[in-house]
Amino acid sequence: RDIFLTLHEYKSGEIDLPDLLIRLCDIPGIQLVKAGFIAQLTLGKVGCLDIHNLRMYGINASTFKFTDTTTYATKRKKAELYIATCERLGGSEYLWDAWCENLAECHPTKFTSKHHVSRVHCDYLGA
């Protein structure tokens, strides 16, 4: 499934946010965390709870994983939980800012500030 088509379906109201994440997870190699990252970067919604964030907030990584046999109902529940968790932790903007700040602190020779981290990611996207 094409990412841009899926994003268009969401923006036009054809699908809701949990289904957007589920459809993005149909792309090989994409799970909820990366789907949340795609939504964060393209729509300013959800967020990316990568391994660093999961550890920081004490969340088990398997909580948001799908397998080949995961039913739609379970995927939907996990997607809803993922969205709710991101919101509970402060939302997309807060998670982005905190992640950029952490990355800048962990890699001071690569990044001058959290703003530099953010700018590099925007540059990669052509934004």
Please state what every model-predicted region is.
Residues D2-A127:
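C-terminal accessory module of base-excision DNA glycosylases/AP lyases that mediates lesion recognition
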